[in-house]
């Protein structure tokens, strides 16, 4: 290798080395120049807790509906708002559409009142609804009801009738 080639290679190496140092210095100063964001200050609000009305179904007595919320406070930006809600259609409405109860089996028939009763304990309340812890319901004793015939029992009856016709 000639001295001229050697010097040329050395200059290239020195230029690359200086470029690397320059890039590292630029990156370091860019990171140092960034300001750390101060944590957001938590505002202590004068606003009170939201108080929600009961869910009012859009149509019928269950399904989708709306509820209104209000809160108090001198410096509140929003004191009223409307929220979507849903009333399950399989819940017993007489205890409040937002209260779900777990019921025990029906009790024995009371001959004096001709009613049988059962109690339910609160299983779930939607949207902080005001629900009773336990409820009691009554219904007339009435006749003993037979369970509805299942599809299988209908098939058995049909097969039995077919056999009777064949024997005739």
UniProtKB/Swiss-Prot annotation:
Which tissues carry this protein?
Answer: Expressed in brain. Hardly expressed in bone. Abundantly expressed in the growth plate. Intensely expressed in the cartilage matrix that forms the hollow for the secondary ossification center. Is expressed selectively by the osteocytes of the lamellar bone, whereas it is hardly expressed by those of the woven bone. Is detected in the matrix surrounding the osteocytes and in the canaliculi of the osteocytes. Is distributed on the surface of lamellar bone.
Extent of the signal sequence: 1-32
**Matching SMART domains, A to Z?**
PTN
What segment(s) does the record annotate as region Chondroitin sulfate binding?
Answer: 92-99, 123-131
Region Disordered: start and end of each range?
139-168
Give me the ranges of the annotated region Chondroitin sulfate A binding.
147-168
Asked if the Swiss-Prot or TrEMBL record annotates the protein with the keyword Lipoprotein, the reply is no
Q: Which UniProt keywords apply?
A: Disulfide bond, Growth factor, Heparin-binding, Mitogen, Secreted, Signal
Describe PTMs of this protein: Phosphorylated by NEK6.
Where does the UniProt annotation locate this protein?
A: Secreted
A molecular function annotated in GO for this UniProt entry is: heparin binding
Q: Which InterPro entries match?
A: Midkine_heparin-bd_GF, PTN/MK_C_dom, PTN/MK_C_dom_sf, PTN/MK_diS_sf, PTN/MK_N_dom, PTN/MK_N_dom_sf, PTN_MK_heparin-bd_GF_CS
Which domain of life does this protein belong to? Answer: Eukaryota
How the protein assembles, per its UniProt entry?
A: Interacts with ALK and NEK6. Interacts with PTPRZ1 (via chondroitin sulfate groups); promotes formation of homooligomers; oligomerization impairs tyrosine phosphatase activity. Forms a complex with PTPRZ1 and CTNNB1; this complex inactivates PTPRZ1 protein tyrosine phosphatase activity through PTN interaction and stimulates tyrosine phosphorylation of CTNNB1. Interacts with ITGB3 and ITGA5. Forms a complex with PTPRZ1 and integrin alpha-V/beta-3 (ITGAV:ITGB3) that stimulates endothelial cell migration through ITGB3 'Tyr-773' phosphorylation.
What's the stated role of this polypeptide? Secreted growth factor that mediates its signal through cell-surface proteoglycan and non-proteoglycan receptors. Binds cell-surface proteoglycan receptor via their chondroitin sulfate (CS) groups. Thereby regulates many processes like cell proliferation, cell survival, cell growth, cell differentiation and cell migration in several tissues namely neuron and bone. Also plays a role in synaptic plasticity and learning-related behavior by inhibiting long-term synaptic potentiation.
Q: Report the sequence similarity comment from the record.
A: Belongs to the pleiotrophin family.
Q: What is this protein called?
A: Pleiotrophin
Q: What gene name is given for the protein in this entry?
A: Ptn
